[in-house]
Amino acid sequence: MAQQKKPTALAVMNDFQIVSRYDGMTPEDLEELKDQLEDLDQDTGIACRSIKIPSGGGTAYEVQGEDDDTDPMKTITGVVVFTHRLSGYWPNAYGSSNNPEDKLPTCASMDGKTGIVQKGDNTGEVITCKTCPWNQYGTARDQAGNQARGKACKNMRRLYILMDGDPNLYLLTVPPTSIKDVNNQLAKIAPYADKVVTLSLEKATNAGGTPYSKVVVKRTGVLPPAAAAVVSELHRQIKAQYQNMALTMDDYTAAPERGKAVDVTPDDAEWEAMNGGGDFQEAPPHAPQGPAL
């Protein structure tokens, strides 16, 4: 009789640093900074930098740095503080319009369950995603306008990530072609907010010979209790605000090569890879770590 393989215990990563840009500031300095920020009338919502997936099957993430420049990173090691699914329906193909308003979806859902029409005569109408005709397979259109096997409404997932020793919060939007794999990987590490993970990209090729990038999430270690408690509190704060983060076409599209539009409609091979049974998969809910705050 074959012996069952015992799960490998994850090492506690005591060297992983959860830092704040305000560490070391006196109460007086913090109060002065608060006054300065309020005077700048900053936008409400969650302040975070972007992580983009490259086009053309690239294997390095494009991570937003200082002054909006980007730094290529083959791997990203950090903590998934919060994650949620979201969906957006754009009737036009990417790059088919120069109107900035067309970046906004006609309908958007911040939980993948209930959508709200964003523009047009039916603005404000509430839509049930499961039964919406645009959220069914076979309703997608490719760049040429031909029917494709995917969904017209694009199912995605947002990951809010903290990196080691970095005070900035980062946002990665997982595209439809990586949804199934990422959901399965998150399920293996749940509850996820006390786990350190490493994200990478694998090059894949669709049936038409076009390369694309797939998101890979692997377990790396476990946070010590004190750091896990800090992440749990940050999770609570993001959960209270995440629905204020607008969904735009930038969430759905890859970082393009210069001068090239990106075909973001999954082809048959990609559709088969992400269609595990027809239903959108949800990762397990977050279980708070450390003491209740």
Spell out what each predicted region is:
Residues V126-I127, T210, P285, P291:
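Aromatic-enriched hydrophobic runs in primary sequence
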Residues M1-G56, P224-L293:
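Glycine- and charge-rich intrinsically disordered segments
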Residues R149-P224:
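Extended serine/threonine-enriched, polar tracts that run as long, contiguous segments within proteins
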Residues V12, V19, V63, V79-V81, ...:
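Extended aliphatic helical segments
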Residues A2-G165, A292-L293:
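OB-fold ssDNA-binding interfaces and closely related basic DNA-contact patches used
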Residues N92, R141, G209-P211, A229, ...:
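Generic alpha-helix signal with a bias toward terminal, lower-confidence helices
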